[in-house]
């Protein structure tokens, strides 16, 4: 990558060192705690499926039953597989049904029974991880067969009506019109559900519920489109909220390609407890690493509440922290869709030059990451002509700065849920800019010591200063004080805290052992 900003390599190294210092205590916290969703994800990998007549998933019934008898601190794998042996059952879903009926008691076995339970749990979870491995190999095979999109950035488009059977033809039409990645945005508030709904769904609110069956249906439909178009069309969903680990496991089992995955989004904008979501994030990222899924992080959201000029450095800080957390969980650089956005008020003088400085800074700090570039939303007024022009400038900045994933902006943002015709016009805009200026990046070199370079240096310096302060006080304190997105979220508050447990001395999680490389 050509260095265009002349960043100080010592300062860049210092920024990464400070991010690691700020992030390390959070990783230790995540390594010493578990959550109901982590344990449910383990059981999903072990093969538990389905829901009771009220729609409550059997994994929820089983984890709740174990927690009521022995707590969560030992992990659920050993108590569950011990009970399976005592009840002389082979099907974990059947055990969940008996547990829900109150006819099974759980205990923490010792000695030979504990060894046997660990062996059984590991065998079952390893089979689930092998399924994830097969789906990853399948993706790699299909990418070789159909090919990747010929251009970068990939064109990423949101489709979601609430009805998966309506989403499918819309997604296929979007792929034909040029979309490379389809995101099925979730029904409003799903991130606050502490369970994953079951089955195909036909109604949602400003989005479509994320379920394993919906994942399967859409992936199959986009495979058809990939065959038809001669390029592999990627599918995106959301591993955020209270069920991050389960969403990651289901995405791996159903061969999704990208997942939104950032605990900061849940903390700031869904008031989810910080400890809960950092524990969940680490496990979900380990699953994503194994599944070959590209994560997308949510820094763009800060700029919807905070000012995009004044708080630009908080985006850089968050990107550096996300890189540290992702690497620690096993994700490679090519899997880091670090987020940022074109959200500066267009009335600010030189706003386009500022956007170029910020976008180029992200590109140069993370040269091997496929950055996720998000369109203007906050300053879309309902004037669709102005909106289309703004989106054109956004697309141009994406091309000039080598972004990896470009979310298509809608000129009707803040007016209506997009019509098919709105998407078509938006895609025409992207196709024109990438077709006319896709190679302009090689000619675009900011003036040495000029406005763009100076702004990028200033943002990096501010990011380092903020990381120094965060390191002195702790990341959880900084989040509690409203450092990011001007939202104050203390570590002892928020949704989902009651689903967190500290590890006991004999805690056992076969999925983590396998994902961290102690065999498969």
Please state what every model-predicted region is.
Residues 225-232, 330-335, 368-372, 439-454:
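Flexible, glycine/charged-enriched surface loops at secondary-structure junctions
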Residues 358-422, 440-448:
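Hydrophobic alpha-helical bundle architecture
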Residues 167-180, 248-249, 280-287, 395-396:
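Short amphipathic alpha-helices and their capping/turn segments at secondary-structure boundaries
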Residues 153-161, 181-185, 231-239, 258-263, ...:
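Hydrophobic faces of well-ordered beta-strands that scaffold small-molecule active sites
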Residues 204-332:
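Conserved, well-structured core segments that form the ligand-binding/active-site neighborhood
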Residues 180-191, 254-271, 322-323, 394-417:
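Glycine-rich phosphate-binding active-site loops on the catalytic face of alpha/beta enzymes
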Residues 1-167, 173-178, 186-214, 241-247, ...:
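Long, compositionally biased, glycine/small-hydrophobic-enriched stretches that function as flexible linkers
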Residues 137, 141-148, 196-234, 278-295, ...:
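Alpha-helix-loop-beta-strand connector modules within alpha/beta enzyme cores
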